[in-house]
């Protein structure tokens, strides 16, 4: 029974604990000993970068159109005005020059992605060279390596969406790599790209 004379915050926490039983979990988490060496914060840095990536990515999603359809650019950036380009590239240009805070969000997303990958690599290197991947933490190690692979795949997909020269070069290389796989390479490349390079579906699938 909650004391009615207790502060409102304590009464609210007691009410919440009676319904979801969170006190034990919170107490365990707060009592957990965390090493005081700075290198143990690199994993936390990756988590913060991931949070920033999610928030900025959601914002950018509202304005980006992952379509290879050719359009004529009529936006604010004069050097490209009147030139044909894909709708994906036009939406990226519009994000930089026409959408409020669009360029800031793009830059934050870009640098957060780079720092995210770098912090994962450094964190895994610390775990490896300190032997922290050994039993009983081998499952944590495998999860970390899997997350690194997924982060690299997502990073590749992200910069491939813009449909500029850099993304086109990367997609062409990836298409050739898939195509070189014996026996199933041709089938897999056609399945992923929706036909011969550049294909008509790859941008929407990456998105």
Say what each PLM segment does:
Residues 1-207:
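Membrane-embedded alpha-helical bundles that constitute the cytochrome b-like, heme-associated redox core
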């Amino acid at each position: 029974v909650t004391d009615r004379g207790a502060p409102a915050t304590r009464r609210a926490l007691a009410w919440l604990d009676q319904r979801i039983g969170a006190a034990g979990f919170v107490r365990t988490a707060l009592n957990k000993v965390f090493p005081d060496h700075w290198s143990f914060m690199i994993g936390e840095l990756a988590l913060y970068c991931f949070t920033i990536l999610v928030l900025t990515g959601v914002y950018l999603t509202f304005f980006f159109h992952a379509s290879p359809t050719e359009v004529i650019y009529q936006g604010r950036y004069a050097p490209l005005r009147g030139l044909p380009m894909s709708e994906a590239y036009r939406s990226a240009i519009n994000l930089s020059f026409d959408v409020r805070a669009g360029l800031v969000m793009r830059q934050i997303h870009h640098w957060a992605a780079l720092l995210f990958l770098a912090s994962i690599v450094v964190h895994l290197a610390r775990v490896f060279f300190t032997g922290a991947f050994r039993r009983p933490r081998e499952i944590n190690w495998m999860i970390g390596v899997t997350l690194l692979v997924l982060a690299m795949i997502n990073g590749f997909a992200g910069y491939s969406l813009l449909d500029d020269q850099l993304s086109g070069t990367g997609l062409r290389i990836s298409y050739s790599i898939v195509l070189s796989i014996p026996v199933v390479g041709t089938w897999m490349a056609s399945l992923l790209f929706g036909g011969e390079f550049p294909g008509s579906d790859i941008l929407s699938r990456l998105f």
